[in-house]
Amino acid sequence: MSKEQKTFYLTTPIYYPSDKLHIGHAYTTVAGDAMARYKRLRGYNVMYLTGTDEHGQKIEQKAEAKGLTPKQFVDEIVSGIQDLWKKLDISYDDFIRTTEERHIKVVQQIFEQLLDQGDIYLGDYEGWYSIPDETFYTETQLVDKEYDADGNLIGGKSPDSGHPVEKVREQSYFFRMSKYADRLLQFYEENPQFIQPESRKNEMINNFIKPGLEDLAVSRTSFTWGVPVPRDPKHVVYVWIDALSNYITALGYGSDQQEKYENYWPADVHLVGKEIVRFHTIYWPIMLMALDLPLPKKVFGHGWLLMKDGKMSKSKGNVVDPVPLIDRYGLDALRYYLLREVPFGSDGVFTPEAFVERVNYDLANDLGNLLNRTVAMIEKYFDGKIPSYVKDGTPFDADLVELVYSTVKKVEDAMEEMEFSIALTAIGQLISRTNKYIDETQPWVLAKDESKREQLGAAMYHLAESIRYVSVLLQPFMTKAPQKIWEQLGIDSSLTTWESLETFGQIPGNTNVQKGQPLFPRLDVEEEVAHIKSLMGGSKKPEEAPKDEKEESDEITIDDFSKVELRIAEVIDAEPVKKADRLLKIQLDLGYEKRQVVSGIAKYYSPSDLIGKKVICVTNLKPVKLRGELSQGMILAGSEGDQLRLATVDGALPNGSLVK
């Protein structure tokens, strides 16, 4: 590595191999992979680390139940995890296992150092413990508490996962967390970008640090599957020191070969789920302070990928296995959905309907159809050879090129903030604009007039070159489709670099195109939604709720009103419904998905009047068909006499925002 080359060190959490991983784990790792691929495209020397946290009581118990040693148990699951990452095209640079000697040896060194300098001491622990979470909780942190007849607390649940806790008492080594609380707060103030999104920082300060940090139990004696404490082998090093230190042990810290550590540490970003932000922004920084090591530059706590009935969880059995989705719909479809559907810092809901819509609307209709039409027209009008570049050959070229350049900037800005959905939205807007360019230039009309031959050539070139830009911008997110696009456009690797985006007009004239298979075949919505639901175990119908026999009232309660889900939506397309003078078919962007609504407003608005308006949509209405068109909601409007106006929203609230 040259000294001038910038480095970028990115990590996922190390996953707990108590069972197969699900699509929620894939979400984190695919996001990290997109970031790693982007940084490599920008010329960085990237270290992308993932791995497995393999010790603990839960694994010890599961292995015993299966008649296996803990190591045999985790070896089998870890092999499956590595197979999954291969199937997802995860381009990790190292995979750390906490059962590896390179890790165990350094964990013991760290524990001994902290013990010798007085940051760890021996004491007794009594408190509440969740085995699945491998986490201790104070009485005040528990939820759903249970009391006996005398008012004594006898149980409760983890505030992070809802798992039950049990009372434990055992001897333990403790880490003096409280000693570093003020220093940690000062670090937060001096490094405002350390915890992202911002809301996570406020949660850490108000919920954990200001109430007073308690010293942390860092060893256990109630199980043996862990790293032994060197001077007291009846204790095993607990997860906080064992698991968190993987970020430096994987780099060779504490070993004879520290070159990677010196090159890459401190980490540029730790990617974690929001439920473990506390461990990475309080426990880990304090541990590093005690070791007198630099702190990571950023911890990004992303949201959860939820099911309609709540958090996806192995213990609940409501998980989605990504493998059947990849096998049926292709890797790129799944990677695109995961990164486009949900803003990375927010929670999102996985639904079969949204998945199929993303594939059909964004990938098959918009991207796939654009490539197919472009290649077909170049074959038809120019014998399969891309014409030479002519600047401003049509009146629409300048606007398209301007959007091409601005899209590159939008993607770069979004990626620096890990705003994957915003980056993909910008690319999607360029795809839509390029499709519109076909309608504006009307190549089929130009082809009929020999005097318009140069304009026709300019249109074909601008289409091909714009698609090239799209393909390069998609590389961090999709690992298969860009290569297929390059093959159809006949472009070589020199035109697939990020540097090639600096100047429009790079494809040489006379480049041969070659039509290929559709990038993304269009899916049968009803059939594929049903198939995905069957994979999710969703074929069972919920029992009908008992009907309320009370007489209806003109008044409603706040509970009644709260059942109505109102969200801000942007109109992205509209057209009349055939043989229905009053109806318009309207396409809405809700941020997390696109929907179609049929509305009786044709008398008051033309389709072009609606494009770009921010409207309020009722999003939890049961879908219905009106004149054969599916309507998935209702947009709000006010009326008096023969006047009607849509309820619109001012300001910059994002699509999908709840109206309260």
Swiss-Prot record:
Keywords assigned: Aminoacyl-tRNA synthetase, ATP-binding, Cytoplasm, Ligase, Nucleotide-binding, Protein biosynthesis, RNA-binding, tRNA-binding
BP-aspect Gene Ontology terms: methionyl-tRNA aminoacylation
EC numbers for this chain: 6.1.1.10
Region listing for Disordered, in residue ranges: 535-554
Motif 'HIGH' region in this chain: 15-25
Disulfide bonds listed in the record: none
Enzyme class at the top of the EC tree: ligase
Signal sequence, start to end: none
Residue span, tRNA-binding domain: 560-660
Reported function: Is required not only for elongation of protein synthesis but also for the initiation of all mRNA translation through initiator tRNA(fMet) aminoacylation.
Record protein name field: Methionine--tRNA ligase
Organism of derivation: Halalkalibacterium halodurans (strain ATCC BAA-125 / DSM 18197 / FERM 7344 / JCM 9153 / C-125)
